Amino acid sequence: MSTLLIALIALIVLLIIILVVFLYYKKQQPPKKVCKVDKDCGSREHCVRGTCSSLSCLDAVKMDKRDVKMDSKISSCKFTPNFYHFTDTAAEQEFGKTWHSIKITPSPGESHTSQEICERYCLWGTDDCTGWEYFGDEKNGTCNIYNNPYLALKYTKDHVLYLPRNHKYA
């Protein structure tokens, strides 16, 4: 009987030690910093879904865009202030169920690139833009402005695709 009592006391002491160590460890982890833009974060960190993170761009896209389906050939992207920027990437047809195409030919005196014009179309006071892609050269091209939140990205040469960061459809 006394060995059973000693074993029970030892088990209780062990559980208390594990609980104290667990609570101490949780207390030592710094809280995640809340953010709205990258400038709110430290160097080498980006604002992803409202918290500062050191995730790679592709991992950030997978976290920010919940159900993203990405072609395995897509190996990188980069952060821009309002978008995730992909090169050699286009939207699968089901992503563009609801989209409109805009032919871009900047005037000679225009100081903005065709891609900057596409970005402005997407940011023009609407939350409905879930992404845009540009294909063409520096002078002439086409913007596809998407307003449907289905995400499926494919590898395609000479396309540039942008997905809004920290977006309501994420």
Curated annotation (Swiss-Prot):
Subcellular localization(s) per the UniProt record: Virion membrane; Host cell membrane
UniProt main location, coarse: virion
Membrane topology term: Single-pass membrane protein
Spans within the Intravirion topological domain: 1-3
Residues spanning the membrane: 4-24
Inducing factors: Expressed in the late phase of the viral replicative cycle.
This protein's GO CC annotations: host cell plasma membrane; membrane; virion membrane
Regions of this protein lying in the Virion surface compartment: 25-170
Keywords: Early protein, Host cell membrane, Host membrane, Membrane, Transmembrane, Transmembrane helix, Virion
Family statement: Belongs to the asfivirus inner membrane protein p22 family.
Protein name per the record: Inner membrane protein p22
Protein source organism: African swine fever virus (isolate Tick/Malawi/Lil 20-1/1983) (ASFV)
